[in-house]
């Protein structure tokens, strides 16, 4: 897992060069937006249970067969596993947003996820739909447009961070589809 700083140093070291120019400008921007980044992560994690439960509920509303006796969300145990998986994905997205790097998400969450779900018979389209609902909710919290929020969210233009969060969810969708 690399954060924004480690990534810049590693890249410069691999070229046997000093850190400078565009790399320093990118780090300056990362630092200047640090409070927005922290507030964005806080707004997501403070509303994590709502984001995940809304995503799973939305997925089930669109595909009620998931809670029928042969469905993948039938029984409390399977529903709990579905909610747990959503929480794990959201947690790793928040880690990626905090560090400004997707490697923690890719290495510790997405690696082998599609194969695991396939072996369990979990429908990829339902998973992808739940992730897209989580994406919409998380972006709304970062942009301060969510209707239900537990705390104040980042002030100022957070469209760049919202886009970054959306990109992390897109990686999840691509990994499970």
Swiss-Prot record:
Localization terms from the record: Plastid, Chloroplast thylakoid membrane
- According to its record, what are the GO cellular component terms? chloroplast thylakoid membrane; phycobilisome
Sequence positions that bind (2R,3E)-phycoerythrobilin 1: 50, 54, 61, 129, 147-148
Q: Which Gene3D superfamilies match?
A: Phycocyanins (1.10.490.20)
Task: Look up and give the membrane topology term.
Answer: Peripheral membrane protein
Chain residues that bind (2R,3E)-phycoerythrobilin 2: 72, 77-78, 82
| Known partners and oligomeric status | Heterotetramer of 2 different alpha chains and 2 identical beta chains. The subunit composition could comprise any combination of 2 out of 4 different alpha units with an invariant beta unit.
> Taxonomic classification, please?
Eukaryota, Cryptophyceae, Pyrenomonadales, Pyrenomonadaceae, Rhodomonas
Please tell me where (2R,3E)-phycoerythrobilin 3 binds in this chain. Answer: 28, 35, 39, 154-158
Q: Which residues carry this modification: N4-methylasparagine?
A: 72
Alphabetized InterPro entries for the sequence: Globin-like_sf, Phycobilisome_asu/bsu, Phycobilisome_asu/bsu_sf
Recorded family membership: Belongs to the phycobiliprotein family.
Enumerate the Pfam families for this protein. Answer: Phycobilisome
List the SUPFAM superfamilies hit by this protein, alphabetically. Answer: Globin-like
Give UniProt keywords alphabetically: Bile pigment, Chloroplast, Chromophore, Electron transport, Membrane, Methylation, Photosynthesis, Plastid, Thylakoid, Transport
Q: Which organism does this record belong to? A: Rhodomonas sp. (strain CS 24)
GO biological process annotation, one example? photosynthesis
By its UniProt entry, which PANTHER family does this protein fall under?
C-PHYCOCYANIN BETA SUBUNIT, PHYCOBILISOME 32.1 KDA LINKER POLYPEPTIDE, PHYCOCYANIN-ASSOCIATED, ROD 2-RELATED
The protein here is known as: B-phycoerythrin beta chain
Additional facts recorded: The light-harvesting system in Cryptophytes contains phycobiliprotein complexes. Unusually they are composed of either phycoerythrin (CPE) or phycocyanin (CPC) but never allophycocyanin (APC), with only one type of biliprotein being present in any one species. Unlike cyanobacteria or red algae these proteins are not arranged into higher-order phycobilisome complexes, and they are found in the thylakoid lumen.
Record's function text: Light-harvesting photosynthetic tetrapyrrole chromophore-protein from the phycobiliprotein complex.
Q: How does it get modified post-translation? A: Contains three covalently linked phycoerythrobilin chromophores.
